Protein backbone atom coordinates (compact mmCIF):
# COMPACT_ATOMS: atom_id res chain seq x y z
CA UNK A 1 0.00 0.00 0.00
CA UNK A 2 1.08 3.57 -0.57
CA UNK A 3 2.46 4.66 2.81
CA UNK A 4 1.25 8.24 2.30
CA UNK A 5 -2.36 7.26 1.55
CA UNK A 6 -4.60 7.42 4.58
CA UNK A 7 -8.25 6.41 4.46
CA UNK A 8 -11.35 6.94 6.58
CA UNK A 9 -14.31 4.61 6.02
CA UNK A 10 -17.87 5.29 7.06
CA UNK A 11 -20.07 2.85 8.94
CA UNK A 12 -21.53 1.47 5.71
CA UNK A 13 -18.10 0.15 4.72
CA UNK A 14 -16.83 -1.50 7.93
CA UNK A 15 -16.17 -4.87 6.29
CA UNK A 16 -14.28 -3.20 3.46
CA UNK A 17 -12.26 -1.19 6.01
CA UNK A 18 -11.17 -4.38 7.80
CA UNK A 19 -10.07 -5.93 4.53
CA UNK A 20 -8.16 -2.83 3.45
CA UNK A 21 -6.34 -2.98 6.80
CA UNK A 22 -5.43 -6.61 6.15
CA UNK A 23 -3.96 -5.43 2.85
CA UNK A 24 -1.82 -2.90 4.74
CA UNK A 25 -3.88 0.28 4.36
CA UNK A 26 -4.16 2.82 7.19
CA UNK A 27 -7.95 2.95 7.60
CA UNK A 28 -9.81 4.61 10.46
CA UNK A 29 -13.47 4.02 11.21
CA UNK A 30 -15.95 5.06 13.86
CA UNK A 31 -19.46 3.69 13.47
CA UNK A 32 -20.77 6.25 15.96
CA UNK A 33 -19.94 9.16 13.64
CA UNK A 34 -22.08 10.45 10.81
CA UNK A 35 -20.58 10.67 7.35
CA UNK A 36 -20.22 14.45 7.68
CA UNK A 37 -18.44 14.13 11.04
CA UNK A 38 -16.09 11.49 9.67
CA UNK A 39 -15.40 13.66 6.62
CA UNK A 40 -14.42 16.54 8.91
CA UNK A 41 -12.01 14.27 10.82
CA UNK A 42 -10.66 12.82 7.57
CA UNK A 43 -9.82 16.29 6.31
CA UNK A 44 -8.06 17.24 9.55
CA UNK A 45 -6.00 14.03 9.41
CA UNK A 46 -5.29 14.20 5.67
CA UNK A 47 -7.36 11.14 4.80
CA UNK A 48 -9.57 10.22 1.87
CA UNK A 49 -13.09 9.28 2.93
CA UNK A 50 -14.61 6.20 1.32
CA UNK A 51 -18.37 6.17 1.68
CA UNK A 52 -21.71 4.90 0.40
CA UNK A 53 -23.44 8.07 1.61
CA UNK A 54 -24.93 9.68 -1.51
CA UNK A 55 -25.07 13.07 0.20
CA UNK A 56 -21.24 13.12 0.25
CA UNK A 57 -20.61 11.81 -3.26
CA UNK A 58 -19.54 15.20 -4.70
CA UNK A 59 -17.44 16.39 -1.76
CA UNK A 60 -13.71 16.86 -2.25
CA UNK A 61 -11.47 14.09 -0.87
CA UNK A 62 -14.35 11.60 -1.01
CA UNK A 63 -14.51 8.36 -2.96
CA UNK A 64 -18.12 7.31 -3.34
CA UNK A 65 -18.26 3.52 -3.52
CA UNK A 66 -20.84 2.55 -6.12
CA UNK A 67 -21.30 -1.13 -5.39
CA UNK A 68 -23.24 -2.81 -2.62
CA UNK A 69 -21.36 -6.11 -3.04
CA UNK A 70 -18.24 -6.47 -0.90
CA UNK A 71 -15.97 -8.01 -3.56
CA UNK A 72 -16.96 -5.33 -6.05
CA UNK A 73 -16.34 -2.66 -3.41
CA UNK A 74 -12.87 -4.04 -2.72
CA UNK A 75 -11.96 -4.07 -6.39
CA UNK A 76 -13.44 -0.61 -6.96
CA UNK A 77 -11.52 1.03 -4.09
CA UNK A 78 -8.22 -0.72 -4.86
CA UNK A 79 -8.43 0.32 -8.52
CA UNK A 80 -9.72 3.88 -7.95
CA UNK A 81 -7.10 4.66 -5.30
CA UNK A 82 -4.30 2.89 -7.18
CA UNK A 83 -3.51 0.59 -4.29
CA UNK A 84 -1.24 -2.44 -4.62
CA UNK A 85 -3.00 -5.06 -2.50
CA UNK A 86 0.05 -7.31 -2.40
CA UNK A 87 2.63 -4.68 -1.40
CA UNK A 88 2.30 -4.65 2.42
CA UNK A 89 -0.32 -7.21 3.44
CA UNK A 90 -0.74 -8.29 7.05
CA UNK A 91 1.04 -5.30 8.56
CA UNK A 92 -2.00 -3.81 10.34
CA UNK A 93 -4.55 -5.11 12.79
CA UNK A 94 -7.87 -5.72 11.06
CA UNK A 95 -9.74 -4.68 14.21
CA UNK A 96 -8.04 -1.50 15.44
CA UNK A 97 -5.71 -0.41 12.58
CA UNK A 98 -2.49 -0.38 14.64
CA UNK A 99 0.70 -1.81 13.18
CA UNK A 100 1.61 -5.44 13.78
CA UNK A 101 4.96 -6.10 15.44
CA UNK A 102 6.86 -9.40 15.27
CA UNK A 103 6.83 -11.12 18.65
CA UNK A 104 8.95 -13.99 19.95
CA UNK A 105 7.22 -17.36 19.79
CA UNK A 106 7.75 -18.10 23.48
CA UNK A 107 5.82 -14.95 24.41
CA UNK A 108 2.59 -16.22 22.86
CA UNK A 109 2.53 -19.71 24.37
CA UNK A 110 -0.62 -19.11 26.41
CA UNK A 111 -2.19 -16.60 24.02
CA UNK A 112 -2.84 -18.85 21.04
CA UNK A 113 -4.46 -22.27 20.75
CA UNK A 114 -2.02 -25.15 21.42
CA UNK A 115 -2.29 -26.50 17.85
CA UNK A 116 -1.42 -23.04 16.47
CA UNK A 117 1.59 -22.75 18.77
CA UNK A 118 2.75 -26.24 17.77
CA UNK A 119 2.41 -25.61 14.04
CA UNK A 120 3.75 -22.03 13.64
CA UNK A 121 7.07 -20.36 14.30
CA UNK A 122 6.27 -16.73 13.48
CA UNK A 123 3.80 -14.52 15.28
CA UNK A 124 2.90 -10.83 15.28
CA UNK A 125 1.16 -8.78 17.92
CA UNK A 126 -1.01 -5.73 17.42
CA UNK A 127 0.62 -2.69 19.02
CA UNK A 128 -2.84 -1.37 19.91
CA UNK A 129 -5.13 -4.15 21.11
CA UNK A 130 -2.63 -6.97 21.66
CA UNK A 131 -4.33 -9.38 19.25
CA UNK A 132 -1.97 -12.12 18.02
CA UNK A 133 -1.64 -12.95 14.33
CA UNK A 134 0.21 -15.81 12.65
CA UNK A 135 0.78 -16.94 9.07
CA UNK A 136 -2.30 -18.51 7.57
CA UNK A 137 -4.67 -16.67 9.88
CA UNK A 138 -6.07 -14.91 6.82
CA UNK A 139 -3.51 -14.96 3.95
CA UNK A 140 -4.76 -17.93 1.92
CA UNK A 141 -8.39 -16.74 2.05
CA UNK A 142 -7.45 -13.18 1.18
CA UNK A 143 -5.25 -14.23 -1.72
CA UNK A 144 -8.08 -16.40 -3.07
CA UNK A 145 -10.51 -13.48 -2.95
CA UNK A 146 -8.00 -11.12 -4.58
CA UNK A 147 -7.44 -13.68 -7.34
CA UNK A 148 -11.19 -14.15 -7.81
CA UNK A 149 -11.70 -10.42 -8.46
CA UNK A 150 -8.64 -10.04 -10.65
CA UNK A 151 -6.36 -8.18 -8.24
Residue spans of the language-model regions?
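Long, charged N-terminal interaction/targeting segments
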Residues: 1-88
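Short cysteine-rich clusters marking metal-coordination/redox-active sites
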Residues: 93-96, 126-129
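Flanking scaffold residues of small Cys/His-coordinated metal-binding clusters
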Residues: 87-91, 118-121
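Short functional micro-motifs and their immediate structural scaffolds
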Residues: 98-102, 134
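Short, intrinsically disordered terminal segments enriched in charged and Pro/Gly residues
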Residues: 142, 146-151
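Short, structured loop/turn "capping" segments at alpha-beta junctions
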Residues: 84-90, 101-104
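GST superfamily/GST-like fold recognition
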Residues: 138-140
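Short linker/helix segments within small regulatory modules
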Residues: 110-123
